Amino acid sequence: KKVCGQDFPVSLRYSVESKTKGFREGALPGESFTEAGRDMAESEKAAKYLQDAGYDMLNCDNGTYDAWYWAHPPIYMPENCNLEDVAHIRKFVDIPVVCAGRMDPAAAIADGRIDGAGFARQFLADQEWVTKLMNDKEDDIRPCILCHNGCFNMCHYKGVPNDQALSDSLHLARCAVNAETMQWEKHKIVPT
């Protein structure tokens, strides 16, 4: 804010709870465990502190490196797995709170439980999905199947990982359902 001015919006990706049982031990939905990282009581105080420090929005999820699947829920995680925690945190701040991670946000936004929803993987699957929603073409949307095979480089063929090099930072993301994602220079039709 000192550099860009007070009217420049600053948001923070904020994990409400760590969902971590211990070093390299993430918790699963519905599991009874003792939180080793940030718990809800700490998060309630931290969210208010972040607002007072000047953040204009909290873009929330759950998880840590040891429980990464909360921030990027795969198909086996329940839909709206972060919603209750994020909606709870909204009560402690006066700035917009966005919820990320595999969700259907319409009812939660309409009810005022959250202010918005964060999406990333769906844009890899279909970069035009918002336009298609706005134009009543929902049936034309190529959906993210939550597989992590392309976007997280987790697919292997005969023991060989996909062709994404760690140094490929300009075309880092891939998508299992959209071969063109971040590969426009590689996969294209060249007029002859």
Where are these regions (language model features)?
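Flavin-dependent oxidoreductase catalytic cores
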Residues: K1-T192
